[in-house]
Amino acid sequence: EFAKWLSPYAKLEVVELPDSTVAKEGLAILKSLERERNAAVVVLSEEGREFTSVQFAEKLGSYDRKIVFVIGGPYGLAPEVKQRADLLWSLSKLTFTHELARLLLFEQLFRATNILHGGSYHNP
């Protein structure tokens, strides 16, 4: 649902890679990112920086290029993927399935774009 709500604000493309070992998945992610050389890469990671929704909206608004978000598989992410990131972002100190992380990411993307466009979805 949030993906549909995002459509007025941003083009959204979901690329899923098959579950694999951390090393193989890392190589596949890096290969996929090769075609996105100019994009800002935001990797979701427990070790990442936490933001309030308003701070995240401001960060999102500061990028002047395409943004690629990376969510790891069930065994985490290869160090090389984290090193490729322009930003390591933590949704929470909790661990989520990648499906739930995607839903939370979509909701926060919608919330952030709504904040940036002066919408009424977010109540401070």
Where in this protein do the model-derived segments appear?
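Rossmann-fold NAD(P)-binding glycine/threonine-rich loop
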Residues: 72
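Long, amphipathic alpha-helical "stalk/connector" segments that mediate intersubunit docking
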Residues: 1-6
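Structured adenosyl-cofactor binding patch, chiefly the S-adenosyl-L-methionine
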Residues: 79-123
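Conserved nucleotide-binding/hydrolysis micro-motifs of P-loop NTPases
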Residues: 48, 75-76
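S-adenosyl-L-methionine/SAH cofactor-binding core of RNA-modifying enzymes
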Residues: 10-68
